[in-house]
């Protein structure tokens, strides 16, 4: 998981230009998002985890996230709740492969903020005068691999996995699709 999820999470956090006390929201707490929480915390960021599943937010809490928000189907209500309880974010990272979530992330950051999109999908329309930056990123380089290994060793990153025998690969995929796995599924031959 470090060479796929770990590198993707690391690269996305780096793209968000982390620094101490920067308010970063992570949309999509699963196989990649749970790693991003840890990388952002190592950088000293104030991290908010956003997911539609409570069980994923429980994982985020165990990993030290500062705030958790349940993503609701009403974008307007979600944004009002976040702004009222916490204020807008400095940056957001999107791992959830849903265009509406990307749109919500863009709307959840301050003027001058940044959204890092680390998934596939379309970038919704946004207003240029809000001075927001949108960056795309996926996977990383050989140097990123070295950095992830070093950071993992020095900080004891926790990779949350659920294992399945290879014969249950289809079951694992169905569980992943239905968000029934806390983070990463690993097949064992």
Residues of each region from the PLM?
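Short helix-loop-beta connector
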Residues: 17-23
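Short hydrophobic alpha-helical segments of the AMP-binding
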Residues: 13, 36, 40, 127
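Adenosine-nucleotide cofactor-binding segment
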Residues: 23-29, 39-104
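Short, well-ordered coil/turn residues at beta-beta hairpins
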Residues: 93-96, 118, 189
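C-terminal hydrophobic helical "lid"/dimerization subdomain
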Residues: 103, 145-189
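Rossmann-fold dehydrogenase core element
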Residues: 114-116, 124-162
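A glycine-rich, Thr/Ser-enriched phosphate-binding loop motif common to dinucleotide/cofactor-binding enzymes
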Residues: 1-14, 27-35
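Helix-to-beta-strand junctions that scaffold the AdoMet/dcAdoMet cofactor pocket
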Residues: 109-111
């Amino acid at each position: 998981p470090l060479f796929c999820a770990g590198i993707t999470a690391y690269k996305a956090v780096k793209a968000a230009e982390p620094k101490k006390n920067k308010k970063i929201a992570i949309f999509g707490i699963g196989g990649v998002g749970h790693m991003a929480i840890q990388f952002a915390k190592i950088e000293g960021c104030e991290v908010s985890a956003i997911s539609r599943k409570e069980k994923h937010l429980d994982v985020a809490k165990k990993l030290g996230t500062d705030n958790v928000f349940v993503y609701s189907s009403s974008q307007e209500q979600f944004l009002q709740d976040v702004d009222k309880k916490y204020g807008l974010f400095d940056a957001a990272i999107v791992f959830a492969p849903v265009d509406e979530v990307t749109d919500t992330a863009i709307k959840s950051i301050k003027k001058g903020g940044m959204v890092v999109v680390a998934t596939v999908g379309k970038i919704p329309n946004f207003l240029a005068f809000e001075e927001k930056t949108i960056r795309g990123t996926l996977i990383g380089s050989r140097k990123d691999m070295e950095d992830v290994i070093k950071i993992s060793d020095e900080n004891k990153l926790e990779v949350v996995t659920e294992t399945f025998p290879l014969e249950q690969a289809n079951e694992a995929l169905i569980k992943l699709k239905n968000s029934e796995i806390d983070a990463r599924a690993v097949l064992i031959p």
